Amino acid sequence: ADINFEKIHFRPFRTLVLKNVEIIDRNPVADASGASDIKVDTFFRAEYIIARFTLEGLIRQQGIHLDEARISNAQMNLVLEDKPDAGDGDTAHDNLSRIFRLKKPETPKQSEKEIFFIRDVEISDMGFSMRNHGSDKTPYHGGINWNDLDVKDIDITAEDLHFKAGIMSGHAERVSFREKSGYRIESISGNARVGRGKTIIENLKLKDPWSRLDLPEFMMSYENVKAFKDFISRVRLDGDIADSRIDFKTITYFAPQLEGNRLKAGISGRFAGYVDNFDIIGLKIASDAGGFTGTINGSMKGLPEIEKTTIDAKIDKFNMTTEGLCLFLSEWMKDGELDLSRYAKGHTFMVTAKASGLMNRLDINADIYSLIGRADADIRLENITDSGNPIRISGTAETDDLDIGKLISSDLIGPVT
């Protein structure tokens, strides 16, 4: 690559200023699939890079120490590309590794060497793109396009940025950005460690236009950055959720097949696994629509394809009304509304249940208590997410002084056992 800059200003042992810096790829690669004839030759550019330091910080044996680093009006373009097969079947490569001749060692080295420490970091008005010009592309179905990622308006304020032993760590006071898909982050803060296939964030607080998340601990595990091309099945997520609010509008940018899901709820608990195969532990949920609150433990497999998604869950002490239940189920339906409002109107039920099976063919064993009586049910629900067919309920039920009249809003019958 060629490294150019318009102006350099150096105040000995205090400040270094670079203006209009750019790193130009001499041999940009065309898209192997032929989907685009664009060659990305600019790897990096920045209007200003400013570093402030002391003589002591420069001559330390532990690595470069800077008091402050500022980057403004910058752009970085990462290109995923093919390389010749060296016999190991691995043809994945990228322009960063090619330009700087970075090679993956045959035996990974666990160096404890410190590379740098920066006390204060500020990045303003930066962009980042990641284009997949390789032959291995993940099909695009909507939301964020991991084959053509384009992030703008990146603003970062951070402190104690440290790179040692192959791990980057630091405290992010505030991070914000927007992606061309329409997704945007209004603010992120937390203490982060990134490296060796993991991103660990403590006290993560995230806010976008739809959701608000508070995670005392959050971790992503992945083989390498290329795993994010198939985020749903190759990036493992583990986290503790404090009092938060989730809107599925946020999730659809990462799992576009869930487009149309209108669920909004307050949540807290723990999750572990991949988007398409995860466990939830002690997840407390309260639907924004009301009438549907409780705790869930279990697993879900198959997302984002709702028709193939399976559930194995236990529901503890769920308080719900028929209005709340039908609103909750309707939010999972792309079209139409489920209406059970004429049944048991105004009555609250406490439910303990087990559910298993496909989302569209769900077996439920439930114990139901209320002021109008008690019931045990062993039923199957079908066509829950199929808007083209009516919901079908089959199975057996036992009641104990359950007021059927109040259940169906009729005076013709009373309590039944």
Regions found by a protein language model. Give the residues of each.
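Outer-membrane beta-barrel translocator/channel fold
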Residues: 244-248, 321-322, 406-408
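Flexible beta-edge/linker motif
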Residues: 6-86, 101-133, 150-173, 195, ...
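Extracellular/lumenal and peripheral-membrane lipid-interaction modules
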Residues: 1-4
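Solvent-exposed beta-strand/coil patches in large extracellular/periplasmic or lumenal scaffold regions
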Residues: 94-136, 152-180, 187-188, 200-204, ...
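Extracytoplasmic loops and strand-loop junctions of Gram-negative outer membrane beta-barrel proteins
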Residues: 250-253, 333-337, 400-403
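Membrane-embedded beta-strand positions of outer-membrane beta-barrel proteins
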Residues: 239, 269, 296, 313, ...
